[in-house]
Amino acid sequence: RNRYVKKSLSCNVAPENTVLMTSEPKQIVPFTKSYIKQFGVVCSCQPDMKGEHVRMAMPNLPWFVGIDFKDGKVTYTKTYDDLKSCSVPEKTKLISVITSNKNHTKGHHDRLAFVEKLKKHYGDKIDVFGRGFNSFGDKWDVLAPYKYHIAIENSQADYYLTEKLTDCYITNTYPIYYGCTNAEKVFPKEAFLSIDINNAEEAIRKIDALIASETFENSGDVLASCKDKVLDEYNMYEQIARVCDTLDLTRPKERVTLKPMPKMFTWDRIKRELLSRNYWKLRSEPGI
């Protein structure tokens, strides 16, 4: 999943039954045409991937609640059974948002600018977590006590839906969401509020109306249904199993060799990346 074959890999398998599953947009993890052509099935959230063997699909990702990353160590604080049997947590706080103080790209810049406007508008009613703000170990602690969470994806595109949204459902938290443009293919439209962080004034008006209408209090059933869907239908293993169920196991096996990904980091690409990062650093400086 999202890892390139680093060395040639050979195995006995029907070529049609080799599977690649991607979980990042093209600008983060790109794949060449020659690389994806090696696989019989490609499940991808990258809309520009073409071919009869390509299936557009939401990323296959784990959830990040119930996992403590404190001090660089990974500790599992809640099992599947814990999450499945857990009742709705006590909601003592209003809104949380996770971001970081990184400001290298336009996406970083837009997200930070939006969060600053949220802080100015909501004051102590909103808690901001992430690098450069309030640190945390287990994402459960920044979702479970809150009625609402503002979930901001790293990019906005069809099919790019990550744990930023689904973790909200595991904690029975109502998501205010920027990201996947066809999320309603997976979750009902009444299960989240879609906003545009590039239009902060309109987004804040929508959030205010959401809170005023007590949407969280009136969404218990739909949030519970989405929680079950995340845990039972969209967990990693279930998604892999569904793909495997579509394969034809009667196809004859042969010796198949998957070749490594060609190098893509040319000097031109590196220069463009550095220029982009420095541009947004300069733009973020006061008076520039």
Regions found by a protein language model. Name each.
Residues 2-21, 33-127, 139-149, 156-288:
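Pol beta-like nucleotidyltransferase catalytic core
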Residues 5, 27-28:
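Terminal end segments
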Residues 24:
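Active-site beta-to-alpha loop of glycosyltransferases that engages the nucleotide-sugar donor
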Residues 27, 133-135:
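Short acidic loop-to-helix transition motifs that present clustered carboxylates
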Residues 130:
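Short loop/edge segments at beta-strand edges and connector loops
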